[in-house]
Design a protein with these regions (language model features):
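Surface-exposed amphipathic alpha-helices with a cationic face
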Residues: 17-24, 115
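Conserved acidic residues
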Residues: 1-4, 75, 122
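Active-site/ligand-binding loops adjacent to catalytic centers
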Residues: 21-100, 139-177
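Short glycine/serine/threonine-rich phosphate/pyrophosphate-binding segments
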Residues: 6-17, 39, 103-111, 135
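Redox-cofactor binding/interface segments in oxidoreductases and associated redox assembly factors
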Residues: 5, 79, 101, 126
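Catalytic phosphate/nucleotide-handling subdomain of diverse soluble enzymes
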Residues: 112-129, 137-149
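Short beta-strand segments
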Residues: 6-7, 31-33, 125-129
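Terminal helix/beta-alpha structural elements that buttress the NAD(P)+-binding lobe
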Residues: 2, 98-106, 114, 151-152
């Protein structure tokens, strides 16, 4: 009934649009887009912004609209924050054992938002389009997530609140003169 995908270059979206227009015109095309990209506003409001933000999710999102773009069949776009993307990707690993990358987290988060808005059951396809093996030091690293404000530490009210990487856990790098 629907397919959720991301746009790094609109080639995939244009190809899907043309294919489903002939093969299954009832299938709804939904874009998962990082917050900061111009695509969500363009799809949902028809406004092409000249200002884009920045995002940490890799491989999807646009700061301009390439000439090849054909958004005529796209029903809706969802802007997903970096935190939502990373947390969805981590949840995909812990609950399903699938090591997807950051853009897969964006697609999953958008698909869940789309599904929650529906009033009748639908079949929804989402691709895990990138592997998480290149994100082991990023979205799958708790310290990186903490350093970038995507995870919160529980305050204990003692010195451990100031020491992020305890020596006892062999997480502290010590260099002697």
């Amino acid at each position: 009934d629907a397919i959720v995908f991301g746009c790094g270059s609109p080639g995939t979206m244009t190809g899907l649009s043309r294919f489903f227009a002939k093969a299954a015109p009832h299938v709804e095309l939904i874009i998962a887009d990082p917050v900061g990209s111009i695509l969500t506003q363009y799809v949902n409001e028809g406004v092409l912004s000249t200002k884009s933000g920045s995002w940490m999710v890799e491989g999807i999102g646009e700061d301009f609209l390439p000439d090849i773009s054909d958004f005529t069949r796209v029903k809706k776009a969802y802007a997903i924050s970096d935190k939502e993307s990373f947390m969805a990707g981590r949840e995909l690993l812990t609950k399903e054992g699938v090591l997807g990358g950051s853009s897969s987290g964006t697609l999953l988060a958008a698909a869940l938002k789309y599904c929650r808005e529906q009033t009748a059951p639908k079949k929804v396809v989402v691709f895990v389009c990138d592997t998480g093996n290149k994100y082991l030091s990023k979205m799958y690293n708790d310290y990186w997530m903490l350093d970038n404000g995507f995870l919160e530490r529980e305050a204990k009210g003692d010195l451990s609140d100031l020491i992020l990487r305890p020596y006892a856990k062999r997480d502290t790098v010590v260099v002697s003169p």
